[in-house]
Amino acid sequence: MIVGIGTDLVEIARIAALMTKRNEVFAKRILAQQELERFKQHGQPEKFLAKRWAAKEAISKALGTGFTQGVCFTDMIIGHTDQGQPLIELTGKTAEIAQQLGIENWSISISDEAHYAVAFVIAESRS
């Protein structure tokens, strides 16, 4: 059963401008430690960060909380399978809230094209 759906669209230039002002400080606010390592090595860091921003905003919307009740960017880790399929891992208070809602499965799609990054998330329970 679908518990929540979330989507987010972000302009990559907006993220690039924030990075210019605060670069790694801004990235540390958005990325979990594992993601930060990949960010530092990425050839297009503004796209990497924009896609993570969109994904995490979409997750918060699927939870129905936004970034309240202890939900935070760094409790959301966006990884990938060997084939490139994006995966969601939650930790901390964000994971607790997902568990309370009965969420057992996440589906996520992330994409970017020229000026924008977009993410779409579905949160599901068994019943």
Swiss-Prot record:
Keywords: Cytoplasm, Fatty acid biosynthesis, Fatty acid metabolism, Lipid biosynthesis, Lipid metabolism, Magnesium, Metal-binding, Transferase
Enzyme superclass (EC): transferase
Chief localization: cytoplasm
Gene Ontology molecular function terms on file: holo-[acyl-carrier-protein] synthase activity; magnesium ion binding
Protein location: Cytoplasm
Matching NCBIfam families: acpS, pantethn_trn
Family: Belongs to the P-Pant transferase superfamily. AcpS family.
GO aspect biological process, one term: fatty acid biosynthetic process
Gene coding for it: acpS
EC annotation from Swiss-Prot or TrEMBL: 2.7.8.7
Protein's name according to its UniProt entry: Holo-[acyl-carrier-protein] synthase
Lipid biosynthesis keyword on record: yes
Catalysis performed (reactions): apo-[ACP] + CoA = holo-[ACP] + adenosine 3',5'-bisphosphate + H(+)
Keyword Secreted: no
Function text: Transfers the 4'-phosphopantetheine moiety from coenzyme A to a Ser of acyl-carrier-protein.
Organism this protein belongs to: Hydrogenovibrio crunogenus (strain DSM 25203 / XCL-2)
